[in-house]
C-alpha cells in the first residue's frame, strides 16, 4: 500500500533516489579510492588501506538534507544547516557535491567519474580533507568535532537575521553534554520580529560509540513533556521504512515552515510574545540502509554502525562482498549517468545559486561582513596631567566607548555584547544607556533594562555567551564578550575549537575573513581578594598563547587610555582571537592619550618619566605587564629611587604580550636588536607579570638576556584577603620586587642588607596590620606616584 503524505509517487521516488545518491557517495568516501561507480568487480586495491570515518549518523543527516532541499525549493526559504554530529562529514560533503557547490569551489573534484574518484580518495586521506564538517566543507559553520555547541551556534547565526532559518541537527549523544543541555534555553532570547528561526532536529538514532543514549530511551510522552517544558512544540518523525519516513518528514516540514512563517508574521516588533517554536524529534536507525549484520553480529540500528561497520575489506573476501553488495543496493546506475554525473532529474531537486545550503552566504559570513561604524576613541580619553595623579575605572571608560559603538551601529544591527550576568559588574553598564538586555521570558514590573529588542546578551552560562558569539561572528557580524577572568576557563575548549577553525579557514581563499572574537577579562586575579581562591586564576592567557601566532593576540593595557586604544583596535580586526585583560577597580592613570597611542602601537615601551637612566645604560630594568603589576612595579621603583638615588633604573611596560617573541615566532614580535635595546644584553630584569611567571620565560627564552630575567607573577597563592595582600602572597608586591632588585644588584652587603631588612619589616607590619584592621595599611592604600616627569 503506498505511503500516505504530501509527496506524489514521482516526488517520492525522486527524493528517495536523491537520498540513495547521498548515501552512496558517503559510503564511497569512507571505503573507496578507485572504481567509484563499481563498474568492475570490487578488488582489494580499490579500497583504502585505512578505513576512517563515521557511517552511523550519516544516512540520517542525508535524509534531513534532502528534505531541506525540497522545502527550500518549495517555499523559496533561506536555510543553513548546522550538523551537530560533525563526524557525519561524509554526508555533508556528499550533499554539497550533489548540489554542485563542492565542484564550484574545488574544480578538481569534478562532476564526473574522475571527480568522484578524487572525492572518495581525498576523504580522511593524507593530503585530502578531514573526517568532520570542517571549514573545508561548504555550507558549514560548525565542525562538530567536539560535541555540545551545535544549537548555540545555530541561535548565534539566527540573531539579527530575520529571513534565515537555521536547521540544526542535534545528535542524541551530543544532547547529553552540558553545553547542549543549556542551549535549549536560547529560545528565551530569540525575538521573532527581528531574528531568524532555529529549527532543532533532535536525531535519536539510539547509540553513541558503544552505549545507548539517554534521550533515545525515553518515551515519546516524556520527550514531549521535556521539550514543551523548554518552550518548544515537538513534532515526531519515527520509523525505518524509507517511503513512509519520506512522507512523514515532508508533511512535518510543510507544517513547521508554515508555523514559522505564521510566528514571524504575527510577531509585534516592539513587544513580541515568546512563541512556542517547533522542533523535530527524528527517530531513525543508526546506520540506516547499511548492513544489518556482519559476522553474525547486529550492525544496523546498533552501536556497531557508529564508525566503519565493515572492517578489513581489503584482506577479508567476505567483508569485501558485504561492502560491494551494500554499495550496489543503492543502484548507482540509477543515480549517475555514463559520465558519472548526477542524473538531471535528481539534480533538479537541489536549489540553485545561493539558495543551495552549501552556497548560502550566511555560512561564509565574511561575504556579508560590514565594518563597524566606530566613534573616535580619543573622545573618551582620561585627562592625565601627571602620571598617577588621578584614578579612574578603566573598564567603565571602555563601557562609555562601547555604548557609542552600539549607538552608531543600531541601523546595521550587527553588533552585540555578551556576558554571563557580568556586564554591570564589569563596569560596562553604560551600554545599557544605548540598549537593553534581550529577554523573551516573563518580565516583572521591578525588572530593569530587559527588553525583547535588547542587544546585550546575558545568561549565566559562559558556554552560551561564547557559542552565541561564535555563531554571530561566523555569520558575518561583530561582538564583544566580557567575563570574570577566572571563569573564562569554562570555555577553554570552545576557544580551542574556534581558534582551530580560524587557522584552517585563513588558508581557504573562498572563506572570507570574519570579525575577531574579542574577550575582555576583568574582575581579575589581583582584585578578587573578596571572593577568594576559587575566583583567582589568570591562566586563560597561557592557553591562548599555545595557539597559532597568526590567530591570537593578548593585551595588558595598564590604564584607561591604553584600554581605549586596544578596544578600538580589536573591534577593527578580523580572523583573530583578541584577549584583553584589564581591571575594573579605581586605579592610577599613567599615560596621556597621545602617549597611550604611541605605546600601544609599539606594543611596549620605556617609560622614561619613571626611570632614572638619564640616557645611560641602566643598572637594572624593572619591567611589567598588567595594571596591578604596573602599579606595584612603579611603587617598587619609588622605593628604590628613595633608597638608592644614584641607581640607574629603566622601566619597561608591555601592553602587547606577543611582542616579547621574535618576529619568526609571532608577527608582532620585535627584533633581537630592538629587544636588546629595550631590555639590555646583560643587566638584571625584574619582570612583574599579571599571570603565571613561566609564560614570560617561555616567550623570551631565545633572547640574549633571558638568563637575567627574574619573573614574578601569580604562583597559585590565594584566599579571601586584602587587595595588597594578594600581591604579597604571590611575592609580586612592591617590597618583594624592590628586594629582588637589591639582591640582583652588585651593591655589597653593607648597602643591601639594611634595605632588605627594611622591606622585610614592612611586610611583617603589613601582615599584622591587615589581621588587626581588615584593610591595607594607609601607606599602601594612599600611595601615589609623586616624581615629576
Curated annotation (Swiss-Prot):
<dbReference type="InterPro" id="IPR029061">
    <property type="entry name" value="THDP-binding"/>
</dbReference>
<dbReference type="Pfam" id="PF09363">
    <property type="entry name" value="XFP_C"/>
</dbReference>
<dbReference type="InterPro" id="IPR019790">
    <property type="entry name" value="Xul5P/Fru6P_PKetolase_CS"/>
</dbReference>
<dbReference type="InterPro" id="IPR018970">
    <property type="entry name" value="Xul5P/Fru6P_PKetolase_N"/>
</dbReference>
<keyword id="KW-0786">Thiamine pyrophosphate</keyword>
<protein>
    <recommendedName>
        <fullName>Probable phosphoketolase</fullName>
        <ecNumber>4.1.2.-</ecNumber>
    </recommendedName>
</protein>
<dbReference type="GO" id="GO:0016832">
    <property type="term" value="F:aldehyde-lyase activity"/>
</dbReference>
<dbReference type="GO" id="GO:0005975">
    <property type="term" value="P:carbohydrate metabolic process"/>
</dbReference>
<keyword id="KW-0456">Lyase</keyword>
<dbReference type="InterPro" id="IPR018969">
    <property type="entry name" value="Xul5P/Fru6P_PKetolase_C"/>
</dbReference>
<dbReference type="InterPro" id="IPR009014">
    <property type="entry name" value="Transketo_C/PFOR_II"/>
</dbReference>
<dbReference type="InterPro" id="IPR005593">
    <property type="entry name" value="Xul5P/Fru6P_PKetolase"/>
</dbReference>
<dbReference type="InterPro" id="IPR023962">
    <property type="entry name" value="Phosphoketolase"/>
</dbReference>
<dbReference type="InterPro" id="IPR019789">
    <property type="entry name" value="Xul5P/Fru6P_PKetolase_ThDP_BS"/>
</dbReference>
<dbReference type="Pfam" id="PF09364">
    <property type="entry name" value="XFP_N"/>
</dbReference>
<dbReference type="Pfam" id="PF03894">
    <property type="entry name" value="XFP"/>
</dbReference>
<comment type="similarity">
    <text>Belongs to the XFP family.</text>
</comment>
